[in-house]
Regions:
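Active-site loop/helix belt of alpha/beta enzymes
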Residues: 1-82, 166
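Charged (often Lys/Glu-rich) extended helix/loop segments that serve as interaction or gating elements
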Residues: 44, 56-198
Length: 198
C-alpha cells in the first residue's frame, strides 16, 4: 500500500527528496473500488506534501477510471482435443489484444466459465505466436464453434497495449446501453494495420 511504500521511500531516500522536483507515487491505485480508503490516500499525500513543499506529486490511478467497465467478447472459431487437452481457438488474441494476460500475468474472469467441475480448456488466440493462449478455465459443457466467451474487466489495458502483429484484426469498440442496445464507437479494418506500417 502507498503508506508503507512512502515510509520505505523516505527511510531510504529521505536525504535526497528535498532535491527532487517531482515524485511519482506509481499506478495501480483502484480509487473507484468499493471500500478503497480515499481519505487515507488524501491524508497520506497531504502529509507528504507538508513535509516536502514544492515537490510535485504525481499519481497514476490508471485503471481506476475504467476498472470493471469493459468486457472483451470473443467467439469460438474452432475446437481441438489432443493428448487430453481441450483447446478452444478464439477470434481474439491474448498476445495482440490483451498482452497483460501473458505479461503480468493477469487472468481475467470469464462470464461463461465455472469455478469447479465441468471441462478444462486451454483458450487459444488467433495469432501465429506459439504462446498466444491462456489455460485454467473450466466450462460446464463442451465448447463448440460459435460459442460466446466474455472476458470480463478487460478495458484498462486492452485499448492501450494492443498490437496488430502480422495484421491481426482488432475487436470493435462497442458501447452497450442498459437496455442492451449496442452502439459501435470504432470498427477496425486492414487500413488501420496498413497505416501503422507506413
Amino acid at each position: 500500500d502507498l503508506v508503507s511504500v512512502l515510509d520505505a521511500f523516505e527511510k531510504k531516500f529521505g536525504h535526497l527528496i528535498p532535491r527532487l522536483k517531482w515524485v511519482n507515487m506509481g499506478g495501480g491505485h483502484l480509487l473507484t473500488r468499493q471500500g478503497y480508503n480515499v481519505d487515507l490516500l488524501v491524508s497520506t499525500l497531504r502529509d507528504f506534501q507538508t513535509r516536502y513543499p514544492g515537490i510535485q506529486v504525481i499519481l497514476e490511478p490508471g485503471s481506476a477510471f475504467t476498472w470493471q467497465t469493459g468486457d472483451l467478447v470473443a467467439s469460438v472459431v474452432d475446437t481441438v482435443e489432443h493428448d487430453g487437452i481441450n483447446t478452444a481457438i478464439l477470434d481474439v488474441s491474448f498476445a495482440c489484444h490483451m498482452p497483460d494476460t501473458l505479461e503480468m500475468p493477469y487472468t481475467p474472469k470469464i462470464a461463461e466459465a465455472v469455478d469447479a467441475g465441468g471441462i478444462a480448456y486451454r483458450l487459444g488466440g488467433n495469432s501465429c505466436l506459439s504462446g498466444d493462449f491462456k489455460e485454467g478455465y473450466r466450462f460446464a459443457e463442451k465448447l463448440k464453434i460459435g460459442d460466446r466467451i466474455t472476458l470480463c474487466d478487460m478495458n484498462h489495458y486492452t485499448t492501450v497495449k494492443t498490437t496488430m502483429f502480422n495484421g491481426v484484426h482488432h475487436p470493435d469498440i462497442v458501447l452497450a446501453d442498459a437496455d442492451g442496445q449496442c452502439h459501435y464507437l470504432r470498427r477496425f479494418s486492414y487500413d488501420d494495420y496498413k497505416s501503422r506500417m507506413s
